[in-house]
Amino acid sequence: MPPHLIDGEPHDHAHDRPKRQRTPGEPLRIGIGGPVGSGKTALVAALCKQLREELSLAVLTNDIYTTEDADFLRRHAVLPDERITAVQTGGCPHTAIRDDITANLDAIDDLIAANPPLDLILVESGGDNLTATFSSGLIDVQIFVIDVAGGDKVPRKGGPGVTYSDLLVVNKTDLAPLVGADLGVMERDAAKVRQGRPTALISLTDDPAATPVLAWVREQLAAIAEADRHGAASGIAH
């Protein structure tokens, strides 16, 4: 699908849309954010490969000036091309997922219209820093991905993505010995700042299926399926 464009102008971060009320039967929207190079696109690819035989899903990526992440997913044939689309955000990647989400909403509408019925849409943010989060008007739940390359201090530094995401993923754990990162420290500090919200430590090298993340996604899908059976606006499990 063709890329959707926005102007990328900065906006007041205090303004956000109300939390979206998912209508029964609508696809679950999961946001996947995190810094550049943390492994967001590789995680999206892994989830698509595991879920594509059991669910109807689609992917929306956000890149600053290119469609590189969407192109990567198409090249690796994780889903049919028509189920992958991109938003080009301009110079401020967090704007498109938090402050002015119009282009992302339009792209989601196009995916739903082109691929009915969808069960799940994965929305990948452009690479940003630890302050980037999704608008609650855009997604239902969000995953924030960091990796061990920044050292074991990253969870301790916090930030909205680390602290408040519905699932924190510490990626590339196989590299921890090479960079001197203590996974135990990362897990402990994440638990402290996240106050009960789950954290998953993964290595896509050692576990290409991203098993703990996959299990969490299935839990979210089960929660909305249960809500749909009762005909209520979904309450997503955290």
Swiss-Prot record:
GO cellular component: cytoplasm
Gene3D superfamilies: P-loop containing nucleotide triphosphate hydrolases
Major location (coarse): cytoplasm
Family listed: Belongs to the SIMIBI class G3E GTPase family. UreG subfamily.
Pfam families, per database record: cobW
Residues annotated to bind GTP: 34-41
Lineage, highest ranks first: Bacteria, Bacillati, Actinomycetota, Actinomycetes, Mycobacteriales
The protein's name: Urease accessory protein UreG
